[in-house]
Amino acid sequence: MAIRSFKPYTPGTRSRVVTDFSEVTSSKPERSLVVSKHRKKGRNNRGVITCRHRGGGHKRLYRIVDFRRNKHGVSAKVAAIHYDPHRNARLALLFYSDGEKRYILAPADITVGQEVISGPDAPIETGNALPLSSMPLGSSVHCVELYPGRGGQMVRTAGASAQVMAKEGDYVALKLPSTEVRLVRKECYATLGEVGNSEIRNTSLGKAGRRRWLGRRPQVRGSVMNPCDHPHGGGEGKAPVGRAGPVTPWGKAALGLKTRKKNKPSNKYVLRKRRKVSKRSRGGRDS
């Protein structure tokens, strides 16, 4: 997979950088594995906006992805690599030997025709799913379960992988992409390898319209609003925030405030907290 840049024929193509989709082998999804999904547009069950700047975009069909990998001992062949509009990662369509079809997250370097399998005795190969107790130290894994049998919940974005650091008792220490080191039960399953399409981080939409196609609406700075709309609003000209620090539209501290509960029960499983992200690298903007 590679990325493709464009000559500045128009203002929209001047900064446009996209993936070339060379790894995608089929343009149509498997009909038995797609369902329609009502788009919430950032609203909850009462119609109140709970997530701003969402709405519009192209219509989508949701692909049913197998995050559990619970067909143990049944081999499957990779039939195709598909595009998924709901995530940056690609999907691998598996044809199992018993006739069932399933989607999984496509690992990096997986090819059509390759065979994958899940189970405690599966070979140590990319795309196979094993319990963490069977993973060699130093292995790169993705789609990691937090609780046995619940399905992969961590390390699922494009290009992400976690590293098996140590094994002790009933737990395995994983180094997550955020550099956090966390203990996970050894019975939890994970898939070997890293998630494919890692070049997505080097892409650029190029124009506001492409962001609208993805269902993202414009994000307006609070400092250019009226005082009735945002705590940062009002004043003559380019006025400062007027507070000790930036706040959300509802007056809560923003940009750097820790939101994790101090007495969360799962804190005992975190051996090392994730690194602090500086404002320069975060590239934050006015709320």
From Swiss-Prot:
The keyword RNA-binding applies. InterPro entries: NA-bd_OB-fold, Rib_uL2_dom2, Ribosomal_uL2, Ribosomal_uL2_bac/org-type, Ribosomal_uL2_C, Ribosomal_uL2_CS, Ribosomal_uL2_dom3, Ribosomal_uL2_RNA-bd_dom. Residues 258-287 have a biased composition (Basic residues). Residues 221-287 are annotated as: Disordered. The keyword RNA-binding applies. Keywords: Ribonucleoprotein, Ribosomal protein, RNA-binding, rRNA-binding. It comes from the Bacteria. SUPFAM superfamilies: Nucleic acid-binding proteins, Translation proteins SH3-like domain. GO terms for cellular component: large ribosomal subunit. Part of the 50S ribosomal subunit. Forms a bridge to the 30S subunit in the 70S ribosome. One of the primary rRNA binding proteins. Required for association of the 30S and 50S subunits to form the 70S ribosome, for tRNA binding and peptide bond formation. It has been suggested to have peptidyltransferase activity; this is somewhat controversial. Makes several contacts with the 16S rRNA in the 70S ribosome. NCBIfam families: rplB_bact (TIGR01171). This is Large ribosomal subunit protein uL2.
